[in-house]
Amino acid sequence: MKRTHHCGQLDKTLAGQQVQLKGWVQRRRDLGQVIFLDLRDRSGIVQVVCSPEVSEEALKAADRVRNEYLVAVSGIVVERNEQAVNDKLATGAIEVHVRELEILNVSKSLPFQIEADTDAAEDVRLKYRYLDLRRPDMQEAFAMRHKIMKSVRDFLDADGYLEIETPMLTKSTPEGARDYLVPSRVHHGQFYALPQSPQIFKQLLMVSGFEKYFQIVRCFRDEDLRADRQPEFTQIDIETSFLDTEDILAMTEAMMEKLLKETHGLELKRPFSRMTYEEAMNRYGSDKPDTRFGMELIELSDVLKDTEFKVFKGALEAGGIIKGLTLKGGADKLSRKDIDALADFVKPYGAKGLAWLKVDDEGIKGPIAKFFNEAQTAALLAAMDAEAGDLLFFGADKKQVVFHALGALRLKFGKEFQLIDENAFHFLWVTDFPLVEYDEQAKRFVALHHPFTRPKAEDLDLMETHPEQVRAEAYDLVLNGFELGGGSQRIYERELQEKMFKLLGFSSEAAKEEFGFLLEAFDYGTPPHGGIALGLDRIVMLLARKSNLREVIAFPKTASASDLLTEAPNKVSVEQLIDLNLSIISKRS
């Protein structure tokens, strides 16, 4: 039986026509002399009816059918009477009266129902991922993923970009997270690494004169996982010669504008908002701020410079800062127990505690109210735009501790008290990142993005004297508090790249050992170039309104980097280890 139509495509215009369908049985209802089947394929669901008036043989076959049996049916499209119309189905105005039914395959009892909403535990869904992916909302998410990838490819192709593949087996270099290593059978004791990104190769393609490159590429990072991270992920990788930062930002905005219009019918406002790294941290406590709601961090170091409260005073004397957060109407929203729990909430961010005050008609109340005189209270309330019923929170410590603690608290309040417009898409460029930051544990500077990021021209002289003050010609694209990706202008002169490696603690010998091939390439007329890499999985997650990346990756890993479906990673045979000249040793405690 050859399929003539898809289930979700049938409507009243086909009434009276014979159709042949194939799909899975979503639901079966046996009324004795009539059996109703909800037949599902990728396009949707249609009701098919098996009755003795149309076909005794089809009714007998339908009697053997159960949920998720795969069947082929042939029948006539019939318009339902008005009382029988199902408004919940796109095909609810019609049904198919079956003349012939063939069971193509059977199904065991299901571990969970194939429905849009499921209460199945995630580990069960991942173990039976092939069933989970049958659910309509999962099918829709992957249809959107395809649409996004096609939109990106079409846009970049029209703009003159070439899609060029780069190696999956490459050299391990010290440029970021831990590598996934692949042992070489031919070269005993040596290893390939799976790429964390095609960064070096795409720069070499610019040296090669391709000028405009892109790739939708798989990347691998052996790092701790969270809701928006996976060990293998896909990024939209773009590199171009002779374009400056403004050109790259404009190109990316145009691509996202096309993408949102095609997937959601939205017209984006361009140019996107911009904010420097310093401004983002000061206002939102984050380098990827969610700008769908206000509640900005308030600078209080000057207002409270004469404070006698030891915690505040000590922070200022140690070169730290004081910032505040106003929760409007919070006095009635949070109990003392709730407030105490917030002190525990901020501790993982380095905060030693969380000072707070309630505002009422008489002024301020709380454990630290006694440390404020009348003038200080007035100045504080004015600075924090506070009124009766508000709850005020304070962070006093090193800059980064205050930023991270209050930034996280701000997001927590935004979600808990429904301050965020969940239907909005707020794009934001964050620019002027520090080129490097000092790693206290490693006792050296590390690149904030990667070692190939170009310093701002006006800051070049600071690289040797005050490297922590050097800004990068780098930019991140943020959507609703998630970093979609980032990019930069790249270093393309050997001398400057060697200076960058030296700043990061590489000796001349180590730099040559790890990156000699790139340094040599820079001796052959390398053009100015820059680019951007955007996380495809994260884009799909946000546009499909999913809560984590596992919902938009067909076969994802768990939080422990395991695949519950295939049971990877797994042990390999002794013979395989011998081929690779490897042996397993226990890690020393």
UniProtKB/Swiss-Prot annotation:
Residues annotated as binding L-aspartate: E175, R221, H449, R490
PROSITE patterns listed in its UniProt record: AA_TRNA_LIGASE_II (PS50862)
Record flagged with keyword Cytoplasm: yes
GO cellular component term of the entry, any: cytoplasm
InterPro entries named in the record: Aa-tRNA-synt_II, aa-tRNA-synth_II, aa-tRNA-synth_II/BPL/LPL, Asp-tRNA-ligase_1, Asp-tRNA-ligase_1_N, Asp/Asn-tRNA-synth_IIb, AspRS_core, GAD-like_sf
Binding site for ATP: R221, D222, E223, Q230, E483, G535, L536, D537, R538
Signal peptide: none
Keyword field: Aminoacyl-tRNA synthetase, ATP-binding, Cytoplasm, Ligase, Nucleotide-binding, Protein biosynthesis
Reaction(s) catalysed by this chain's protein: tRNA(Asp) + L-aspartate + ATP = L-aspartyl-tRNA(Asp) + AMP + diphosphate
Family label: Belongs to the class-II aminoacyl-tRNA synthetase family. Type 1 subfamily.
Subunit structure: Homodimer.
Protein name stated in the entry: Aspartate--tRNA ligase
Species this chain originates from: Shouchella clausii (strain KSM-K16)
